[in-house]
């Protein structure tokens, strides 16, 4: 089993940002991947969509507050992007290379995850990767978040920011090996 903790950093900005922190952990046990996200701080400054009664696959979740992760196979250009909304909606996309050949990943018909909100917001996803990769393949992972603020500004959070603009697809930012 491989377990690591993480802290996300906002893309550098000249704007004053609300007092927020995004931390969590990621674990891979055989081909089960579990990611725990924790958003803490001034949540009143964040637009958090209400939890829906039905979790559905939706596009463009990254236009609102959304937790994301990217999975790449070591020594391969292909990768997957997973989007998880605090409302319970989700999507998964497959790419053949950097921002190339984006298609909805049909190996997943559901992507169940849990969302809890009190003084902070937590989201936990547990996914069986057997449908897309072998347990013997090494994963390169990027963990990210898009935070929409109550003043309609958006901030982009990641383990690291490798470009001159926020770009979660840059392979250099897939920093966690599992």
Predicted regions and their residues:
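Order/disorder boundary and secretion-linked terminal/linker segments
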Residues: 1-50, 58-60, 159-178
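Solvent-exposed loop and beta-edge segments used for protein-protein assembly and interaction
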Residues: 16-18, 27-33, 61-63, 76, ...
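Beta-strand-rich interaction surfaces with strong enrichment in secreted/lumenal proteins
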Residues: 22-26, 108-116
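Beta-strand secondary-structure signal
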Residues: 23, 34-38, 68, 122-126, ...
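Beta-strand elements of well-folded, non-transmembrane domains
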Residues: 26-28, 39-43, 73, 127-131, ...
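Extracellular/luminal beta-rich ligand-recognition
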Residues: 55-108
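Acidic/polar low-complexity flexible segments
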Residues: 58-65, 73-79, 135-178
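Surface-exposed extracytoplasmic segments
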Residues: 112-129
């Amino acid at each position: 089993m491989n377990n690591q903790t993480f802290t996300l950093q906002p893309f550098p900005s000249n704007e004053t940002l609300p007092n927020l922190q995004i931390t969590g952990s990621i674990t891979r046990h055989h081909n089960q991947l579990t990611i725990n996200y924790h958003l803490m701080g001034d949540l009143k400054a964040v637009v958090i969509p209400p939890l829906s009664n039905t979790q559905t696959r939706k596009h463009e979740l990254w236009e609102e507050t959304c937790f994301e992760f990217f999975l790449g196979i070591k020594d391969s250009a292909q990768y997957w992007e997973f989007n998880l909304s605090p409302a319970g909606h989700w999507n998964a996309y497959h790419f053949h290379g950097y921002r190339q050949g984006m298609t909805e990943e049909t190996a997943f018909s559901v992507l169940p995850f849990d969302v809890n909100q009190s003084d902070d917001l937590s989201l936990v996803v547990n996914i069986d990767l057997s449908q897309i990769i072998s347990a013997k393949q090494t994963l390169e992972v990027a963990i990210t978040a898009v935070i929409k603020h109550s003043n309609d500004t958006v901030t982009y959070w990641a383990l690291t920011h490798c470009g001159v603009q926020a770009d979660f697809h840059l392979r250099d930012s897939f920093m966690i090996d599992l």
